Amino acid sequence: MDDNLQLGDSGVVKNVAKLGRRARLAAEQTSSLEESRHVRKSSSSTSMGEVPPPKPARRQGGWAEETSGSAKSGRRPAVVEDVEDRRLRPQTPQGSDDEGDIPVIPDLDEVQEEDLTMQVAAPPSIQVNRVMTYRDLDNDLMKYSAFQTLDGEIDLKLLTKVLAPEQEVREEDVGWDWDRLFTEVSSELLTEWDQGEKEEQVPLPVL
């Protein structure tokens, strides 16, 4: 085994010639020897007065963080609990509970009691061109005799001679009576039917 293994000054394995199970056993034995040698060196250094460097303290953060008093007593102080309770409570924005911002919906009775008859919408302001009536046209025709010739080319004398006065053209408004109207229409129809029957009974002349 010593022939196949070469160890340096630092105790590191330089070369392994064997392979397989025996080689692994040999490597394990050499590693155990090196570990025991390191343990002896460290014990000798401590006996000589050399102190190993201190281990760094383990730091904890986040939810696992505790104060010295809480670690000793095993119970968290009330101040820390109050702070955490305030932090975990649901916070509402300031001014959200203002009653002035809430809209008020009127009751149905109040809406019905309002008098809507007095509320009249303003009429639209539309300029309408005034249309001349027949009376205005007659007055203009009587005033301006030159109107009988239109544009100096068209002669309207024939039309003005045929025009009838207003009293002859206008009809009086007479109310219709249903019974009277029915009798008049029925009598006219009967006379027409009688005339038609008489014409059918007349014999045709023989040629």
UniProtKB/Swiss-Prot annotation:
What are the protein's UniProt keywords? Answer: Cilium biogenesis/degradation
Q: Name one GO cellular component term.
A: cilium
Q: Which GO terms describe its biological process?
A: cilium assembly; intraciliary retrograde transport
A single Pfam family it belongs to is IFT43
Q: What does the UniProt record say this protein does?
A: Component of IFT complex A (IFT-A) involved in retrograde ciliary transport along microtubules from the ciliary tip to the base.
Q: Which family does it belong to?
A: Belongs to the IFT43 family.
Oligomer status and interactors: Component of IFT complex A.
What is the name of the protein in this document?
A: Intraflagellar transport protein 43 homolog A
Q: What gene makes this protein?
A: ift43a
